[in-house]
Swiss-Prot record:
This is Accessory Sec system protein translocase subunit SecY2. Part of the accessory SecA2/SecY2 system specifically required for export of possible cell wall proteins. The central subunit of a protein translocation channel. The keyword Transport applies. It is a multi-pass membrane protein. PANTHER family: SECY/SEC61-ALPHA FAMILY MEMBER (PTHR10906). Component of the accessory SecA2/SecY2 protein translocase complex required to export cell wall proteins. May form heterotrimers with SecE and SecG subunits. It comes from Streptococcus agalactiae serotype III (strain NEM316). SUPFAM superfamilies: Preprotein translocase SecY subunit. Its main location: membrane. GO terms for biological process: intracellular protein transmembrane transport; protein targeting. Belongs to the SecY/SEC61-alpha family. SecY2 subfamily. Gene3D superfamilies: SecY subunit domain (1.10.3370.10).
Length: 409
């Protein structure tokens, strides 16, 4: 009874235990095999980028299982829905309608990705349409289960979907440790050391920019003492965080799923395979597109996380203002310039730090997996701060009690 009382009263302990339990379920599901599939003969194991993408999105294509799709379908859905609902179009749509749209789009995307992966399987007693559809259905179901687990964690635990992705990436990087030692023994000592040093520098810069902020002076009408001179609006230097990396991999991988399906339908058409170079990190075209997408998404996520329109409207309603800028459109324009400035800065810095190792490893299949390590750990660093910030909010909230609760005591 005492343990139950502690569990009910200690919100931090309760959230940690719930999150830990959901992580265990998530990790176990990654290794639940799909019936009828020859795991040892899975062709996708040779696709380094597909394996990397599955790791980034919480999946596992190195050893195919029920959760192999990860949260990839949900992330692709969020990107598409955001592209088609830019501005205030979705503001008047009910939550139920938005959820329905998201589920429908996610179902279509999950089927496309599931079919592309299931086609790469080898099956017991040969291939059949029934086995293909069954494997696809299981993969799609696994994607929805992961989405459900992430939503449960967001409501009852902490870290939401982000902590599942971080755990998946950490597990994937631990699996790469034997490969790093093997490359070190095969004569790649200098390359491995340079990659590790570059990754450490990138993580240090990521932490520095993550905790740096630009302070915009704000005149708050509700403050009438000496604190009015100290009021400011903090703008993070790296407002996009580590999310841009994850969405870049999503945008690069989804066309590859389409190409896999088209290649299975038109196996004699050589032009289909040639398009794959534009979305693969093993080609110069793919790396350049990767760096461009990193820049674009960094700017986009800066606007999403700061939202100059919403901030300017809130300031106008409260009577607050930025010195030398009129409330409304002028304030919004000023904040938009700040977003462009820092979004472009963080985009260039992340594209450079994440892209240089990929360029260095071009043409070398052995170093390709290790070269992506910098981007992965930058992503882990950025997402870890998001989780820590949420934990800090919960901890601070726990220090305050309800007024009515104090009166009862």
């Amino acid at each position: 009874m005492k343990l139950l009382y502690i569990f009910e009263k200690n919100i931090i302990l309760r959230k940690i235990l719930i999150t830990f339990s959901l992580i265990i379920i998530f990790l176990l599901g990654r290794y639940v095999p799909i019936p009828g599939v020859l795991i040892s003969a899975y062709k996708g194991q040779d696709n380094n980028f597909a394996t990397l993408y599955s790791t980034v999105t919480g999946g596992n294509l190195s050893q195919v299982g029920v959760f192999s799709l990860g949260i990839g379908p949900m992330m692709t859905t969020m990107i598409l829905l955001r592209l088609f609902t830019i501005g205030k179009y979705s503001s008047g749509v009910s939550q139920k309608v938005q959820q329905f749209r998201q589920n429908v789009v996610m179902l279509v995307i999950a089927i496309i990705q599931g079919l592309a992966i299931a086609i790469s399987f080898q099956y017991h007693n040969g291939f059949s349409l029934t086995k293909l559809l069954l494997a696809t259905m299981i993969l799609v179901t696994g994607a929805y289960i992961i989405s459900w687990i992430g939503n449960l964690n967001a409501e009852y635990g902490f870290g939401g979907m982000t902590i599942l992705v971080v755990v998946g990436m950490l597990v994937g990087q631990f699996n790469n440790i034997p490969l790093i030692f093997e490359l070190f023994q095969d004569g790649y000592q200098l390359a491995i050391i340079l990659f590790l040093l570059w990754t450490l520098v990138a993580m240090y810069l990521m932490i520095t920019f993550e905790r740096s902020e630009y302070r915009i002076p704000v005149m708050r009408t509700s403050i009438h003492n000496r604190l009015v001179d100290d009021a400011y609006m903090p703008i993070k230097v790296n407002a996009s965080g580590g999310m841009a990396f994850m969405y870049v991999y999503t945008l690069l991988m989804f066309p590859q799923y389409i190409i896999i399906l088209l290649r299975s339908i038109f196996p004699t058409n050589p032009d289909i395979t040639s398009y794959n170079d534009y979305f693969s990190l093993s080609s110069i075209q793919g790396v350049v597109i990767y760096m461009i997408l990193m820049l674009v998404l960094s700017v986009a996520f800066t606007f999403v996380n700061i939202d100059p329109t919403k901030i300017s409207e809130a300031m106008r309603e409260s009577g607050d203002f930025i010195p030398n800028y009129r409330p409304g459109k002028e304030t919004q324009s000023y904040l938009s310039k700040i977003c462009y400035l820092f979004g472009t800065f963080s985009g260039f810095f992340m594209a450079f730090l994440g892209g240089v190792p990929l360029l260095f490893a071009l043409g070398n299949d052995d170093l390709r997996t290790v070269s992506s390590m910098t981007g992965i750990f930058m992503m882990i660093t950025g997402m870890s701060f998001m989780i820590l910030d949420e934990f800090q909010v919960i901890r601070i909230r726990k220090q305050y009690t309800s007024v009515f609760e104090n009166e009862e005591n």
